[in-house]
Regions:
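Cytoplasmic helix-loop-helix junction between adjacent transmembrane helices
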Residues: 118-158
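Structural signature of the two symmetry-related core transmembrane helices
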Residues: 90-104, 314-333
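Glycine-rich segments within core transmembrane alpha-helices of 12-TM secondary carriers
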Residues: 148-166, 173, 292, 296, ...
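Conserved MFS/SLC helix-loop-helix module at the cytosolic interface between two early adjacent transmembrane helices
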Residues: 74-113
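Helix-breaking motifs and short loop linkers at transmembrane-helix boundaries and internal kinks
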Residues: 55, 87, 102, 108-114, ...
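Helix-loop-helix hairpin linking two adjacent transmembrane segments in secondary transporters
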Residues: 153, 157-207
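A late C-terminal transmembrane helix in Major Facilitator Superfamily
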Residues: 366-405
Length: 434
């Protein structure tokens, strides 16, 4: 714990400007999450080259693409339990280095089974990152900063989705090999893992770059959280009686149902329904997801500023989540009826801008579970969300197959966005004092 040894030293420390180590840590987490999504996208981009090389049937291609998501989803709860038991810093560093290794090892695949194994390993290794972000959100940020912290961690999803296809395809075109592209992506991920391990600390008091002003800002802002941490670990049976937990799981499932549904099916929708070629489709997809990234940052800033003004957490969060999801629902509904391609892309940009405000869901595990249960709650929330993310692309495929159009697929997304508003209104966003 940092201390000052004399009144003069204390006065000097108080006069010094506050360091900003906490925000550098969350920028690193943004980088890790973006890399997370770039590495996920690598197989999708390289599949047209990999499929003929390994003689993959369409069914085998689907298996290959889904392998990551199944292992990623199934490891969310175990990953959260590990974070509650062991040091967050070490798990982040080890997980990032491991997923970089699996990404690079994919280049050595001599048949589809080996490549499948590397994708399963990639999902396992990436699984602790989002719950780890929720854990650090609770220990490094004050209640009035957690919205921005949550959207920095979650903002890597739209940012990585926007950049992934462009970067991986550019590497393949430049190097003339999907294998070399996988190696470079893997090595870059490993270097990011080393950076994260060297800079991140579990608690502000452990970081050499945190000065007295920043440490005092964090500890005083989290006085109630520290008081809760001093108590015994909250029994899970107590948490399971809290309606907010199940509403949080359901709400986040609907968020990822919309996001993953658009992520997987929007390019095909723009190509088949609106006639965009591959180049135009890529540009539109990049624009839509970049709007999501910008929206996520702006939403977190608005939420924190509103909280800092003295507004109650329930008012801020319910209005932010419900309002943004209903605006997104209205835009997607409009896209279902509008025929003009430019108008459709604009509506989807606005929808993605607002739906990503819900990235602030990642501050909820620390609020509801307290320091002792943030990891397992964050892992369970991400498990529920990613199971929806696994199932929704299949559901949308069946809808399109049986109806022959994308209209009812868009209506499905509208319904999911409305349900985000419903479930978000059922959550109590006040700090828990068990």
């Amino acid at each position: 714990m940092k201390t000052t040894s004399s009144p003069a030293a204390l006065a000097l420390a108080e006069a010094a400007p506050m360091s900003n180590v906490r925000w550098r840590i969350f920028l690193i987490l943004l980088l890790l999450t973006a890399i997370n999504y770039i590495d996920r996208a690598s197989l999708s981009v390289a599949l047209p080259l990999i499929a003929p090389e390994f003689n993959l049937t369409p069914a085998m291609e689907g298996l290959m693409l889904s392998a990551f998501f199944w292992s990623y989803a199934l490891m969310q709860i175990p990953g959260g339990l590990l974070l509650d038991r062991f040091h967050t810093r070490g798990i982040i560093g080890a997980a990032t280095i491991a997923w970089g290794a699996f990404q690079a090892l994919g280049a050595a695949s001599h048949n589809w089974l080996v490549l499948l194994f590397t994708r399963i390993g990639l999902g396992v290794a990436e699984s602790p990152i989002m719950p780890a972000g929720a854990k650090l959100n609770g220990s490094w940020l004050t209640p009035n900063e957690r919205g921005r912290g949550a959207v920095l961690v979650d903002g890597g999803a739209p940012l990585g989705s926007a950049l992934g296809a462009i970067l991986i395809s550019a590497l393949i075109a430049w190097l003339g090999s999907w294998r070399l592209a996988f190696v470079i992506a893997g090595v870059g991920t490993i270097l990011a893992g080393v950076l994260a391990w060297k800079y991140i600390r579990n608690h502000p008091s452990e970081h050499p770059g945190v000065n007295e002003a920043e440490l005092r800002h964090i500890t005083e802002g989290n006085a109630s959280a520290h008081a809760a941490a001093a108590k015994a670990s909250i029994p899970l049976r107590v948490l399971l009686k809290d309606r907010s937990i199940f509403a949080m799981f359901a709400g986040y499932s609907c968020i990822l149902a919309v996001f993953y549904g658009l992520l997987t099916w929007m390019p095909s929708y723009l190509h088949k329904e609106h006639g965009l070629d591959i180049s135009a489709m890529g540009g539109a997809t990049f624009l839509i997801f970049m709007c999501g990234f910008v929206g996520e940052l702006i939403g977190g800033w608005i939420g924190d500023r509103w909280r800092a003004s003295g507004a109650s957490p329930n008012l801020v969060m319910r209005v932010m989540f419900s309002g943004s999801s209903l605006v997104a629902a209205a835009c997607i509904l409009g896209a279902a009826y509008v025929g003009n391609t430019g108008a459709v892309i604009t509506l989807l940009c606005v929808a993605m801008f607002f739906i990503r405000w819900c990235g602030m869901y990642w501050c909820l595990p620390a609020i509801i579970g307290g320091p002792s249960r943030t990891g397992v709650l964050g892992g369970t929330m991400n498990f529920c969300g990613n199971m929806a993310g696994v199932l929704v692309p299949i559901i949308i495929g069946l809808i399109v197959q049986f109806t022959g159009a994308y209209f009812f697929a868009l209506i499905f997304f509208v319904a999911a966005a409305v349900l985000i508003a419903v479930f978000s209104s059922l959550i109590d966003y006040r700090e828990r004092t068990f």
